Amino acid sequence: SMLFVIHSILLKKSIFMPQGKACTIVKYELLAAPDKIRIDLRPLFAHRINSEVCPEPRKGEFDLVSSENSTIGVEGKGHKSYFKATSGTWAAKPLWYENLIYEQDDIPETPSVDHLWSPGYVSNDIAEGDVLYVILSDEPITMTIEDILSVEKECSERFENILEQANLPALSSAEQDMIAASYHLIDDRDDPVSPVYTGYPSVEFKARDTFVSLPGLTLATGREKIAERALRIWTDICKENDWVMPERIAPDKRCVFEAADNGLWFVYAADKYTKHVGIRNEDSDIRDAARKITDRYITDIKNLDLTCEKNMLLKVDSDDPLRHWMDAVAAGETVVHRRGYLVEVNALWYNALKVSEKFAEADNDIPAKEKYAEMAEKCAESFREIFWNNEKKCLYDWVDPSATAKDTAIRPNQILAASLSYSPITDDMAKGVIRICWDELYTTYGLRTLDPRQDKFKGRSEGRLDQRMKARFRGMAWPWLLGEFISAFLKYNPTRTDLGWIFMRPFNSHLRHRCLGGIAECFDGMMPYKPHGDVLSAMALGELLRVLHENLQFDE
């Protein structure tokens, strides 16, 4: 809801979308006014997807095809849309709103100047206490005022049910908004595609985004069945591809294989799920899938350029940036060069071995348990030997065994070695990792992707497209990494939940701007920390909800 204050006039505007209905409803309430006021509502029509603009006004591109009282229908660009107000007088006055400049445009290679068409406006005279509804749809609108009041009540009750269902106390309105926003990222229809969206406006189905966000979006909010369904869907997809996890599912349902860590994130999510619901016989297929995925990493995965070396570390034999999550390419240049042993991949790998060891024991497969335990011990030993930077008391981001020198740039990927349930490093090493991430990478809304002291550091998304792409992984801050940082910090400082809340507090303000109740995908790594990317990100929101559930919910 939004409150407009114009002198002594208070006008409240609320927007809600009824579940299962192809419409959006806008409610206007005149809370206070000394006299009657006139309100003119002029709809603007675009008929485009979010990544496009109308480059110039074209005569005849839109037509008013129906007009009856305060209900109109508009046709244009191959689409139809409908507008209805519950009261008022329609006045036809077509015009173009030209040269609308969008303040921020994060969609690559698209212009930010738009033109919108309007056929006229609805005029109303309203007094204090009056309510006016507007319905927007791509289907003819037949809803009566009784129907509108009914769906408004349903939406209100659904919100209350969401809060009651959550597995964490809604201690503030901000947390309530986060819980409610999580429902916009879940598709609970009977569909073979993953039930978790990457965010808005991207709306994609990606493995890593699903598994990172699953504990927060589903387990923390009381939707264990959605988590179970997501794990089973991706299990079937992975099984069909020789237990190699794809990066994403394309719109044509085709599997796309890119990054080396997706399968390891599945094991992470399966572990979180079983910790939450317990070891149950009916989930044996999920545990079995996690073990099969782990076993698949032991053999070479050629389409991911991935090998498991004799030292039990995973090695990426490629310069392809798509093999890891920092995958940006700007003007043909790889933004972050990484190859060989990648720190987050091997931290996840050690975690997967330990989880598989636990699952094997739960299923009474003692030989497999012993095998995973032996491999994990060797992996941890090699991890400490290869990645530990004794000079800076932190971890190298990546190590190419064929190179003569190591990249000493400080990046946030090392935080996973401290935050995951099973850590391949000692407590002293983990505390060093946490310290350097706090000193060099921590910002108000996330961990920077590069130490500001580096020459290549670019903390703001600004300038040419290639410069904006470089900034994503050369200095911008990511909230999902902050979730891992908070978990790591509280893991080794369990009595300092007060600082955990301090790390979370800045998001109270962010939740009131842009996407209400949502967390943006990434932020500038420098003041004023402007948000970018998806206005509602599954990974960002999911990680913060997970922290509330796992680390902070029992703190008084």
What are these regions (language model features)?
Residues A180-D191, R232-E240, S509-L516:
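Glycine-rich, acidic and aromatic/proline-enriched surface loops and short helix-turn segments
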Residues Q176, M245, I298, K302-E309, ...:
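Catalytic cores of carbohydrate-active enzymes
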Residues S1-Q19, L100-E103, T110:
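Extended, loop-rich substrate-binding clefts of extracytoplasmic carbohydrate-active enzymes
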Residues D40, D147-L163, A170, A174-M178, ...:
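Extended, well-ordered alpha-helical scaffold segments
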Residues D319-H337:
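A short, charged helix-loop
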